[in-house]
Amino acid sequence: MLDKSIPYKDLIMKWDGNRQCLLPVCVPPGYRLRTWREGDQKNWARIQKEAGEFGDMTLEQTEAWFLQEYGDRKEALSFRCLFAESMDKEADGVCMAWTEAGTDGSLIPSLHWLAVRDAKKGQGIGTAL
């Protein structure tokens, strides 16, 4: 469960572009990575809620928030939202690669909404995502 006693902080990491430091992606046995599909807002909301995000909001409210925030950008979701899915087609983890506006107007790449269902943590799903 997400420890809400730890204050929230944005973390900015920079990479020097040295490809030699990249590690291969190792997807845990029994999982595959897949991109967003129509209707995945339900999976996204369920995973985020199970990971402790969105506090007292219901699952339906969390899904509605997602649709309000990202619903008009479904084309971008198809290549910016990634799910870890078990062989029985259960989505157990999610992350999004998005962009944020910088103070100078530039677009800054952002990895956010990385979450794994509590029952599936510790299996390498988050690392693969």
Please provide the spans of the model-predicted regions.
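Extended hydrophobic-aromatic, low-complexity segments
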Residues: W44, D104-P109, K120-G124
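A conserved beta-strand-loop-helix scaffold within acyl/acetyltransferase catalytic domains
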Residues: K49-V116
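A short beta-loop-alpha structural element at the N-terminal edge
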Residues: R32-R46
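Acyl-donor-binding surface of acyltransferase catalytic domains
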Residues: M1-P29
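Residues that form or immediately flank small-molecule/cofactor binding pockets and catalytic motifs
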Residues: N18, E38, G102
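Conserved acetyl-CoA-binding loop-helix of GNAT-fold acetyltransferases
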Residues: W113-V116, G122-L129
